[in-house]
């Protein structure tokens, strides 16, 4: 959906927020994105090593793959991986000025109590996040998050 939106709205920056489990289930999307080559497309994957939306089960083999390498292998040359939030914040401002597609893997710590706060409230929490981010120049699209 994010790719289609970026192709339909080429003058609008499109930011897709994704989970690592969701991307693993749809790896072919990276090749499709690379082939379409949208200049206004940024794909951020939150890599916490669990299938979040199905109960935070650990992802099998989570230490054996590297999303940045997978994205590069799929043809997305501008692929980055961050495990430090401060460095990511500084670099992200610079990346916003680059042509896409841009792929970013952001390693985050999975908080075991996080899922409990979301159970039954996903729609409400997503609404709050969207409201918080409104006014940003980026069009936000939540996929598999």
Feature annotation, model-predicted:
Residues 21-22, 49, 108-111:
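Short glycine-rich anion-binding loops that position phosphate/pyrophosphate groups of nucleotides
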